[in-house]
Design a protein with these regions (language model features):
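P-loop NTP-binding core
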Residues: 1-192
Length: 192
C-alpha cells in the first residue's frame, strides 16, 4: 500500500509498530534488532521527555518510502507503557512531530490489542483491518471493532474504519465463500 502511494508521487512514512519487525524485514532491513534507532527508541525518548528530531531513526527505502523501523524492543516498551502518564498517546506525539513531512503515514500493527496498538488507534485518522478468511480471525475482528469503538469514544473521536480487507481468500472453497458472505452480511460495504 505504501509503495503504491509512493509510486503515485505521495510522500509516505511507514511505521512498523510490530515487535516482530516483519514490515522492517520485508523492506530489506533484515536485522531489525541491530538497528540503533527504532520506534521503541523514539517512544522511549518521548516518555522520558527527551527531544526527538523529525528525521531521527527514519530509514529511506529505494522504492521512495520512508520507514520508522520496529523490532523486539517494542515488547519491552509495551510493558513499560502501563505505568506511563498519557500512555495511549505517546505515538501520537511522535506523529505530530513528523506529520508535516508526509502525505500519508501508515502504521503496521501487531495482531494483539496491547498498548502499542492502542497508541496506533489513538494516532490514526482511519484504520484498514486485514482479516484472514477463517473462523478465529473473524471472531477476533469482533473484539477489535469493539476496541476501535472504545478508542473513538474515549481518546480519538476522528477515528474511522476505512475498511475490512479479506486476506488469504481461496474463493474456490465453500468455507472461504461462507466466511466472506458472513463478513459482508455483518459489515456491509466496509468489507473489501
Amino acid at each position: 500500500l505504501g509503495i503504491g502511494l509512493a509510486k503515485q508521487g505521495k510522500k509516505v512514512l511507514l511505521i512498523d509498530a510490530d515487535a516482530q519487525g516483519s514490515l522492517t524485514a520485508s523492506l530489506g532491513f533484515t536485522e531489525p534488532d541491530s538497528l540503533e534507532v527504532t520506534l521503541a527508541t523514539i517512544m522511549g525518548n518521548l516518555i522520558n521527555d527527551e527531544e526527538v528530531e523529525p528525521g531521527e531513526g527514519i530509514l529511506h527505502h529505494e522504492e521512495g518510502i520512508d520507514l520508522m523501523p520496529g523490532n523486539i524492543e517494542l515488547s519491552g516498551l509495551e510493558v513499560s507503557l502501563v505505568n506511563v502518564m498519557s500512555r495511549e498517546t505517546v505515538l501520537r506525539s511522535y506523529i505530530e512531530i513528523v506529520r508535516e513531512s508526509y502525505d500519508y503515514i501508515l502504521i503496521d500493527c501487531m495482531p494483539s490489542l496491547g498498548m502499542i496498538t492502542i497508541n496506533a488507534f489513538a494516532s490514526a485518522d482511519s484504520i484498514l483491518i486485514p482479516v484472514q478468511a477463517a473462523y478465529l480471525p473473524v471472531k477476533g475482528l469482533q473484539q477489535l471493532i469493539k476496541t476501535v469503538g472504545k478508542v473513538k469514544r474515549q481518546i480519538n473521536p476522528k477515528l474511522e474504519i476505512e475498511g475490512i480487507l479479506l486476506t488469504m481468500v481461496d474463493s474456490r472453497t465453500n468455507y472461504a465463500k461462507d466466511i466472506s458472505s458472513m463478513l459482508k452480511e455483518a459489515y456491509g460495504s466496509r468489507v473489501r
